[in-house]
Design a protein with these regions (language model features):
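Structural stabilizers in ordered domains
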Residues: 1-342
Length: 342
């Protein structure tokens, strides 16, 4: 909250008091549209005419024989997340509140956003380390050379679309990997991670391919856990939300599971019932659909009205405090992250 003009940060979430009137705010830039920015002179704002398509691909499974290598890569926690069912109306309603200028959701009592703490707790990803960056080569020659260097085989013309390698080819390659050597298990993990990137962390609107630009970062297996994959995941979500805020956008991509579960943890009046306490916290929401049938029928306009009428205490500042997750054992590698704030 903001007191005397000073923005306070609590529990990793940022909220600023904007002194809202009975309306939320007016949109200042023409390329963006948000029904949350409409006035409430004679009642609640009109529901949005947009209904962005959002699809979530469940991540691939892995062989138990590669668990040691998976832990060494830093992706073991997120690999435990099973099938997730997201809520399209919730995603759409949140996008209507997103402002690209500040990378925050604008609510009647201020602004809030998704933080690195949320990424660490919801996905169990490392948020410290080297930046996930590099040269983006979209050439076919570069793709073939990198795959030949790391796997001794490269996708043919039918196995990739431009710079995107098809999931079907990667899954076939993963099944054919020999796991009786350390090198074979490491190559298996690299393929598994490419699929994880394409289905969850860095997915695009194709839902069929993953850009091979991530592969050079996996070249040295011992360096993989040294990257701040959680930071890259969060940046990708910010970018996806900014693109979805445009008036001409018809579909939203990115790590939407992070968005949904962040809302369920921080805005409990928008959440179904948690299945069972587990880490990473995304695992706690895997079976909500079988327990809360009425929640499935919530519409965009209904959720927008709930957000419009939120009270000042409707946002949970410390959802990861011992009082909130007392039955969940947080692994030491997550607790030791300085910037996590748990």
């Amino acid at each position: 909250m903001e007191e005397n003009g000073v923005i306070q940060e609590t529990g990793g979430a940022v909220l600023t008091d904007l002194q809202y009137a009975p309306f939320v705010m007016y949109l200042q830039s023409a390329p963006f549209v948000s029904t949350a920015c409409m006035t409430r002179v004679n009642g609640p704002p009109q529901p949005s005419s947009r209904n962005l398509e959002s699809r979530y691909l469940n991540q691939d499974s892995y062989e138990s024989r590669v668990e040691i290598e998976l832990r060494d890569s830093g992706f073991y926690h997120i690999s435990q997340i099973g099938k997730l069912i997201l809520h399209n109306a919730l995603i759409n309603a949140l996008i209507e509140r997103w402002r690209p200028e500040t990378h925050t959701f604008h609510l009647p009592h201020g602004e809030c956003t998704i933080t690195l703490e949320d990424v660490a707790m919801i996905f169990g990803l490392p948020i410290d380390g080297m930046p996930v960056s590099g040269f983006t080569d979209s050439s076919t020659n570069g793709l073939e050379n990198e795959f030949m260097t790391q796997f001794g085989i490269a996708p043919t013309g039918a196995d990739h679309k431009g710079s995107g390698v098809k999931f079907t080819w990667l899954r076939t390659l993963k099944r054919r990997m020999q796991l009786d050597t350390a090198l074979g298990r490491q190559m298996y993990i690299k393929i598994y991670l490419l699929l994880l990137f394409g289905t969850n962390l860095f997915c695009d609107k194709s839902r069929m391919t993953i850009h091979w630009k991530f592969l050079p970062l996996l070249r040295n297996f011992s360096d993989i856990r040294g990257f701040s994959w959680g930071s890259a995941c969060l940046a990708h979500l910010y970018r996806a939300l900014c693109q979805a805020s445009r008036y001409d956008c018809k579909e939203v991509d990115g790590p939407l599971a992070l968005l949904c579960i962040w809302a369920w943890e921080r805005l409990p009046f928008l959440a179904p019932m948690r299945s069972y306490p587990s880490f990473p916290l995304a695992c706690s929401w895997m079976f909500w659909r079988s327990q809360f049938h009425r929640y499935q029928k919530w519409t965009i306009s209904h959720i927008m009205r709930l957000l419009d009428d939120i009270h000042a205490d409707g946002f949970v500042w410390n959802p990861y405090s011992p009082a909130h997750i007392e039955n969940i054992v947080v692994p030491n590698d997550i607790l030791s992250i300085d910037s996590c704030g748990v």
